[in-house]
């Protein structure tokens, strides 16, 4: 960006929290990721629209990062604007419906539902990430998923327009939605729940959280579940059968607590993650004949 455009950015986007050449590893669950050219934290939709309008006017690429939980940002970082929705995190309850902004924490949203004795969101009680990312990926666990409860989502198009997509038009599948094809960004979502008993809902949430603590390597940075579940198999079991528990490249290793996870144990890099993922896919294929498909998204530029 030239000096004149940089001055225009500072003038047009005055008052918005924008950080230049900001390392993204400070914000990712993996603790890896190179710099964003411009990392923006809009406080409301008006600031969001200003950022997108400026970026589109100057043909600067932009994307939303979300909570960066099921994501690997490459070591070369991301060009253009990276927009964080941390401050767009409102949650409201209207009858049996919960509406949340895209930056709302998924776990916090389940707690709000529980407080209002609304059942249906318990499956997500321990899933890290944001509402926007959860809708984008059709997040799920323990038999539940976003597709079961979503009513509609407001999305931002690449042109900066807003439209509403009903759940039936989301084309939900296993860890997928139509948004992965259109590139549209969730800015809020509405969920339909059912009345329930507060103590029973709380007990179920605590039970699922306890299971996660027992089975998942929460003590290390990670990108969550690395691979999709292959039909008729479990990814973690296939990885164990290939004797890959503890298998390590650089600072990243296959978790010995849950082989479906890869953990950053010693200042690992995104390249370590990518190399380990590729190695595990190859060795599982050789051992079982099954080709694992990554669930984690990998974005950004590689280092030259």
Curated annotation (Swiss-Prot):
Name of a matching Pfam family:
MurB_C
Its UniProt pathway annotation is: Cell wall biogenesis; peptidoglycan biosynthesis
Q: Which reaction does it catalyse?
A: UDP-N-acetyl-alpha-D-muramate + NADP(+) = UDP-N-acetyl-3-O-(1-carboxyvinyl)-alpha-D-glucosamine + NADPH + H(+)
* GO process terms (BP): cell division; cell wall organization; peptidoglycan biosynthetic process; regulation of cell shape
Active site positions, chain numbering = 175, 225 (proton donor), 295
Q: Which GO terms describe its cellular component?
A: cytosol
The FAD-binding PCMH-type domain is annotated at 31-196
Principal location class: cytoplasm
**What Enzyme Commission number does this protein have?**
1.3.1.98
EC class (word): oxidoreductase
Keywords assigned: Cell cycle, Cell division, Cell shape, Cell wall biogenesis/degradation, Cytoplasm, FAD, Flavoprotein, NADP, Oxidoreductase, Peptidoglycan synthesis
Tell me where it resides. Answer: Cytoplasm
Q: InterPro entries, from UniProt?
A: FAD-bd_PCMH (IPR016166), FAD-bd_PCMH-like_sf (IPR036318), FAD-bd_PCMH_sub1 (IPR016167), FAD-bd_PCMH_sub2 (IPR016169), MurB (IPR003170), MurB_C (IPR011601), MurB_C_sf (IPR036635), Oxid_FAD_bind_N (IPR006094)
Gene Ontology terms, MF aspect = FAD binding; UDP-N-acetylmuramate dehydrogenase activity
Question: What's the superkingdom here?
Answer: Bacteria
Provide the cofactor list for this protein: FAD
Q: Which HAMAP family match?
A: MurB (MF_00037)
PANTHER family, per the entry: UDP-N-ACETYLENOLPYRUVOYLGLUCOSAMINE REDUCTASE
Q: Which family does it belong to?
A: Belongs to the MurB family.
| NCBIfam families per UniProt | murB, PRK13905.1
Free-text function comment from the UniProt entry: Cell wall formation.
Tell me what this protein is called. UDP-N-acetylenolpyruvoylglucosamine reductase
Record organism: Streptococcus thermophilus (strain ATCC BAA-250 / LMG 18311)
What are the top taxonomic ranks of the organism?
Bacteria, Bacillati, Bacillota, Bacilli, Lactobacillales
What gene is this protein translated from? murB
């Amino acid at each position: 960006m030239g000096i004149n455009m940089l001055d225009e950015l500072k003038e047009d986007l005055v008052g918005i929290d924008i950080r230049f050449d900001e390392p993204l590893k400070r914000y990712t669950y993996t603790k890896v990721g190179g710099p964003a050219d411009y990392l923006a934290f809009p406080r409301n939709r008006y600031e969001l629209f200003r950022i997108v309008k400026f970026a589109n006017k100057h043909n600067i690429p932009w994307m939303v990062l979300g909570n960066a939980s099921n994501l690997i940002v490459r070591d070369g970082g991301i060009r253009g604007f990276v927009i964080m929705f941390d401050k767009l995190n409102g949650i409201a309850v209207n009858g049996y419906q919960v509406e949340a902004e895209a930056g709302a924490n998924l776990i916090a949203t389940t707690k709000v539902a529980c407080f209002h004795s609304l059942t249906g969101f318990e499956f997500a009680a321990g899933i890290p990430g944001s509402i926007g990312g959860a809708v984008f990926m059709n997040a799920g666990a323990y038999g539940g998923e976003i597709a079961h409860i979503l009513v509609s989502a407001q999305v931002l198009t690449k042109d900066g327009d807003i439209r509403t997509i009903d759940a039936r038009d989301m084309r939900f599948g296993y860890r997928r939605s139509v948004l992965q094809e259109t590139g549209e960004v969730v800015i809020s979502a509405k969920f339909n729940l059912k009345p329930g008993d507060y103590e029973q809902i709380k007990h179920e949430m605590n039970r699922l959280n306890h299971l996660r603590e027992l089975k998942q390597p929460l003590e290390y940075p990670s990108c969550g579940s690395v691979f999709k579940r292959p039909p008729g198999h479990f990814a973690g079991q296939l990885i164990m059968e290939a004797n890959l528990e503890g298998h390590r490249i650089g600072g990243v290793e296959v978790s010995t607590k849950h082989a479906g996870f890869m953990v950053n144990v010693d200042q690992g890099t995104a390249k370590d993650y990518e190399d380990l993922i590729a190695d595990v896919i190859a060795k599982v294929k050789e051992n079982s004949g099954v080709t694992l498909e990554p669930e984690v998204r990998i974005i950004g530029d590689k280092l030259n």
